[in-house]
UniProtKB/Swiss-Prot annotation:
HAMAP family in UniProt: HMD
GO MF terms held by the record: N5,N10-methenyltetrahydromethanopterin hydrogenase activity
EC numbers: 1.12.98.2
Keyword Ribonucleoprotein: no
Protein name: 5,10-methenyltetrahydromethanopterin hydrogenase
Annotated keywords: Methanogenesis, One-carbon metabolism, Oxidoreductase
Organism this protein belongs to: Methanothermobacter thermautotrophicus (strain Winter)
Function in brief: Catalyzes the reversible reduction of methenyl-H(4)MPT(+) to methylene-H(4)MPT.
Gene3D superfamilies in alphabetical order: Hmd, C-terminal helical subdomain, NAD(P)-binding Rossmann-like Domain
Length: 344
């Protein structure tokens, strides 16, 4: 199998968050006895996993940065990073972040510059600056592109070079539905003709070097292609999940924090209403839908930054407390504390 990786990534944004580390990369490095994998990041980590753990025999990375300032920081011994991550990653991560932030001050952002700790060629990858060269005869094309509105212009340069039946994936910078539309405009309806292309996701749900997981979107690829990618993901990432394409963003992107809170609220509310009060599920669903729809309508009407002007958070303290029983009691006390701090 040939894997084409389009976009090598840059560590500066990972360092800037102040919370990421190399836990998964170090785990893989130890599993396969290749310390140089320990400080890979972004698509390079996922490419190394696919090569070493899933048997992908050809990996090509394409990025214009290879003709510019692709910078490899070699201040840290891979073995030291691995040992630190066995105990507490924060024993070494502050020094790594400090160095990255220092280098980032002088280095241009992608595609003119990028920060890495291992060169892809040292992992047995081929490199190129030509996306068309990379995707030629590729079975799996993993994209790691900038913001969604820039992607059609990038993709249209190589879309004619993708072989029929190839799997094409995106990560965190575009929804699957929008990613699919780019290919649909060129190839037509891929849902009923997936042999043309199989469009889905290989979304890590976090920085790949930190967590071993991948999320695969269903809807725009054949069942065979989804299953193939799922099996590769299980072998390479350790944990793989299939989910409807429209849920990928809410589950994997920044709004996952809100999705988690909302979903936990729905599930605990449902159980309190149906199991304790004995109300039918249809009634619980009707009330839940009203809550979600009206809060969304309020946000759309006044803006997320002005919601408190129309609905005082304190207004819920004297009403929601009457539902503080059963499963809802698992989360409501913490919710009340948050609302109390924000009430007018």
């Amino acid at each position: 199998m040939k894997l084409a990786i389009l976009g090598a990534g840059c560590y500066r944004t990972h360092a800037a968050s102040g919370i990421t580390n190399f836990s998964r990369a170090c785990e893989v490095a130890e599993m396969v006895g290749k310390p140089e994998i320990a400080m890979t990041h972004s698509t390079i980590t996922m490419g190394a996993e696919l090569k070493e753990l899933a048997g992908v025999d050809e990996v090509v990375v394409a990025d214009p940065v290879f003709d510019n300032q692709f910078t490899v920081i070699d201040d840290f011994a891979y073995e030291d990073v691995i040992e630190a991550h066995k105990e507490d990653p924060e024993k070494i991560m502050p020094q790594i972040r400090e160095k990255v932030n220092e280098v980032a001050k002088e280095l241009p952002k992608p595609p003119e510059g990028a920060i890495h700790f291992t060169h892809p060629e040292d992992l047995g990858f081929e490199i190129t600056t030509d996306d068309r060269e990379a995707v030629a005869d590729a079975d799996f094309i993993m994209t790691w592109f900038p913001k969604g509105d820039m992607q059609p212009g990038i993709i249209n340069k190589f879309i004619d070079d993708i072989k029929p039946g190839a799997i094409v994936t995106h990560a965190c910078t575009i929804p699957t539905t929008k990613f699919y539309k780019i290919f649909e405009e060129k190839h037509g309806d891929l849902v009923t003709r997936p042999e043309t292309l199989n469009v889905t996701s290989y979304h890590p749900g976090a920085v790949p070097e930190m967590k071993g997981q991948v999320y695969i979107a269903e809807a725009y690829a054949s069942e065979e292609a989804i299953n193939t990618l799922f099996e590769l993901g299980q072998k390479a990432r350790g944990n793989a999940y299939k989910l409807p394409a429209e849920l990928l963003g809410p589950v994997c992107d920044m709004c996952s924090a809100l999705t988690a809170i909302t979903y936990a609220g729905i599930l605990t509310y449902r159980d309190s209403v149906t199991q304790v009060l004995g109300a039918p599920a249809g009634f619980a669903q009707m009330m839940a839908k009203e809550s979600l729809e009206q809060l969304t309508a309020l946000m759309d009407k006044v803006g997320i930054d002005k919601m408190e002007e129309s609905l005082d958070p304190g207004a819920l303290l004297g009403t929601a407390d009457s539902m503080n029983f059963g499963a809802s009691a698992e989360i409501l006390p913490t919710v009340f504390e948050v609302l109390e701090k924000r009430k007018k």
